[in-house]
Amino acid sequence: MQPPGGDAPAGCPFSGARAAQPAQAAHEAPHVPGEADAQAGWHNAQLDFSKSMSYGDYLSLNSILDAQHPLSPDHNEMLFIIQHQTSELWMKLALFELRGALDAVRTDALPPAFKMLARVSRILEQLVQAWNVLSTMTPSEYSAMRPYLGQSSGFQSYQYRQLEFLLGNKNAQMLQPHAHRPDILEQVRATLEAPSFYDEVVRLLARRGFPIAAERLERDWTQPTRHDETVEAAWLEVYRHPQQHWELYEMAEELVDLEDAFRQWRFRHVTTVERIIGFKQGTGGTSGAPYLRKMLDVVLFPELWHVRTTL
């Protein structure tokens, strides 16, 4: 707000343009672009990128936009490809943020971890919304292109598998789909054999003085997360006295937010599959929708959900 008797408004603080005087605004003709504008650039924007990096260069758009290669003549296959490619990009970012948060937890730097966990939850919301686009594909449209997919399936996504492992849903059998790619197999195996994000949070509870069972702190990391009474007792204390354990309280809620979003992603996945292929077998050999429905029962952070009943 301009104080009485002050100077005229300075105009836009971002573009640097000054506001027009009332007389100018009332009597001057609107500006018509001419030759001088063409030489200077539209609104002083840089137009020649022959000697500097452009938007497309920075984002490697040629590589990204040339990565769609439909195998069928069907129009709808482009949607199918881009849906899955963009999901893989979001998963790449989710893994990047989750690993950053894990490193922060290991060093007790919790505020940065909260920021990264919140971002992962927002990424999962993007993935949930993406199913709305794919659900515009009808069963007849999918049937026209399905024979061209062969045995390829989202079940084989190595980034998704690492995300599951990092969140604690471990299963050594899920290494097998990647055995033909030793470089990828090494990445997925390393995630399987390392502590999950929640394992590191449980270690954090121990560092903060909670009596966590020794067998929970040093367990077989290749096994899925199991409910532990000492971990639930720690979370119960945190929830009963949040002001005394505020960082841990915030961590607990960030994890619940994350799993909530992850469950919604899974639910939208199975609903979209049922909508498009019903209960047919999946291209990767699974039972399709029934397999995905079983995944809805997986609980990533069991004590954080059970403690709500105990409180």
UniProtKB/Swiss-Prot annotation:
It catalyses: L-tryptophan + O2 = N-formyl-L-kynurenine. The keyword Iron applies. Binds 1 heme group per subunit. Residues 1-37 are annotated as: Disordered. Pfam families: Trp_dioxygenase. Substrate binds at residues 80-84, 142, 146, 283. Its cofactor is heme. One of its GO terms (biological process) is L-tryptophan catabolic process to acetyl-CoA. Residues 17-27 have a biased composition (Low complexity). Belongs to the tryptophan 2,3-dioxygenase family. Heme-dependent dioxygenase that catalyzes the oxidative cleavage of the L-tryptophan (L-Trp) pyrrole ring and converts L-tryptophan to N-formyl-L-kynurenine. Catalyzes the oxidative cleavage of the indole moiety. This is Tryptophan 2,3-dioxygenase. It comes from Burkholderia orbicola (strain MC0-3).
